[in-house]
A protein has these predicted regions:
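Conserved GNAT acetyl-CoA-binding A-motif
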Residues: 67-77
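Glycine-rich acyl-CoA binding loop
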Residues: 54
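Conserved beta-strand-loop-alpha-helix junction that forms the acyl-donor binding cleft
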Residues: 76-86
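Conserved catalytic-core motifs of GNAT/GCN5-like acyltransferases
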Residues: 77, 95-109
Length: 140
């Protein structure tokens, strides 16, 4: 299921293993002219956190953006203190690009934001790793 809000498309995430809705993930900061977007606004309930849910959801969005929409860059960003998000980005093949200091104010606190990306020339290798992992996991 999806909901389109201006410059964001939000998808409901359903876990087949848990047989229920477990969260949301979005494509944000969509720049169609430049064929760039960001994967963000990610939220999962406790039962889905640190499971295959995020990894597989991100893979589906990357596949859509690179293979269907022919995008050339997809980014991921997070607060520098959000170590689980930074680790997830790197494990999924996003490359660290740098940190913007004093990038945002969230809940009254100035935050520094780390940026990661996958570009189109890297996509085939990243995609192959994801697909091989899924084949091993589900023994397809």
């Amino acid at each position: 299921s999806q909901e389109h809000q201006g410059n964001r498309i939000t998808f409901a995430v359903f876990s087949k293993r848990l047989n229920k809705y477990v969260g949301n993930i979005s494509i944000t900061f969509i720049e169609e002219n430049y064929r760039n977007a960001e994967i963000g606004c990610v939220w999962y309930e406790k039962s889905a956190q640190r499971t295959e849910v995020n990894r597989e959801s991100v893979f589906l969005l990357l596949k859509y953006l690179f293979d269907e929409m022919n995008y050339i860059r997809v980014q991921w960003r997070c607060d520098i203190e959000n170590i689980p998000s930074k680790n997830a980005a790197e494990k999924m093949g996003f490359s660290y690009e740098g940190t913007f200091r004093n990038y945002a104010i969230f809940k009254g606190k100035v935050r520094h934001t780390s940026f990661f990306s996958i570009i189109s020339s890297e996509w085939v290798e990243v995609k192959n790793k994801f697909e091989n992992e899924l084949l091993r996991k589900y023994k397809v």
